[in-house]
Amino acid sequence: MRRLQRRIVQAQQQGKKRKVRALQFILTRSYSARCLAVRRVVENPGRRTPGVDGQILDTPEKKAQAVEKLSAEDYKAQPLKRVYIAKKNGRGRRPLGIPTMEDRARQALHLLALEPVAETTADPNSYGFRKERSVADAIEQCFILLARSTSPQWILEGDIQSCFDHAC
């Protein structure tokens, strides 16, 4: 599976879009990728939180069934289970949508196929929510850029978090 992901990266770098799609198709149907997707779901901290169907993958038999279900072509996503959790500031609650285990596994499977392309085409100076990148990497890059003789003399900091609370 890792080899397939490397081939997807190479095809993306060469601009071979049809080959990328073909390799992604192969990857999403491979048994090892389906097993890994289910494994990621059952090893996730939210593994004991069922969706609207009430199912959790707590036995080897259920995990094997989930792997087989991922090969089905007649997939239709289930509605999300809506739960309200308290906000950090203590004022009000925010909605949280919880997908079923099957939906989570399918999302994990497609992430395996899409991530090589996303990481290949992403901005090299983007550090948020990226695999193999951390806050420490972003800080290190800031120090490297600011250590130059042509670096800016001022750094401005702004807090725009509250701007997103009222988005439509």
Segments from the language model and where they lie:
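Short, charged/polar micro-motifs that form catalytic or ligand-binding hotspots
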Residues: 10-13, 28, 95-100, 128, ...
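Phosphate/adenylate-binding "loop-and-lid" substructures adjacent to NTP/NAD/dNTP-binding pockets
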Residues: 20-88, 93-94, 99
